[in-house]
Regions:
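Flexible, polar/low-complexity N-terminal or interdomain linker segments that lie immediately upstream
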Residues: 2-66, 152
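Catalytic cysteine-centered active loop of the rhodanese-like fold, especially the PTP/DSP P-loop
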Residues: 91-138, 142-143
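Short, solvent-exposed mixed-charge patches
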Residues: 144, 151-152
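Positively charged, proline/Ser/Thr-rich regional signature most characteristic
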Residues: 46-107
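Solvent-exposed loop/turn segments at secondary-structure junctions
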Residues: 60-64, 79-82, 113-117, 140-144
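Second-shell loop/turn segments in exported
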Residues: 30-35, 80-85, 109-114, 131
Length: 152
């Protein structure tokens, strides 16, 4: 009898854990749009980079040094808040002073695609700081690499 109760309890805990994991994985995807920010693909980001628009890698320095978009600038977003549209920006760190001083200047943010919230959050902070031409490459470095575009 005790074994049966323990077996049921173990299965229940395992099922609950799996359900919570699945729910958190589903919630981790960034939204497809962001008000006040234009979502773009890798080809458009490449055209903008070729015109001199800053392309900003929001990943940590180690990732930037390992591989990034050729010509991208590293401005790491240090993320501690939840991966959610209602994130607590007070928990995170992002140096807005490293962005162009002209708030009308265009800029592109990217990180590691849909599950990476750093570029999404950086776009929100830039928008809320008054920047007017924010572009978010939601597909991030994986999309860039898949298109065969240059990296360093």
């Amino acid at each position: 009898m005790k074994r049966n109760v323990y077996g049921i309890a173990i299965r229940a805990v395992a099922a609950l854990g799996l359900a919570l994991f699945a729910a958190s994985a589903a919630a981790a995807e960034t939204p497809p749009q962001l008000a006040g920010v234009k979502v773009i693909g890798a080809e458009e980001a490449k055209r903008m980079l070729d015109r001199g628009v800053p392309v900003i890698d929001t990943r940590v320095a180690v990732e930037y040094e390992e591989k990034t978009i050729k010509g991208a600038k590293s401005v790491p977003y240090r993320e501690k808040s939840a991966k959610d549209v209602k994130f607590d920006r007070a928990q995170d760190q992002f140096d807005l002073s490293k962005l162009p001083s002209d708030k009308n200047a265009p800029m592109v943010f990217f990180c590691n695609a849909g599950e990476c919230w750093k570029s999404y959050k950086a776009s929100v902070l830039a928008r809320d700081a008054g920047y007017k031409q924010i572009y978010w490459m939601r597909g991030g470095l994986p999309e860039w690499v898949a298109k065969g575009l240059p990296t360093q």
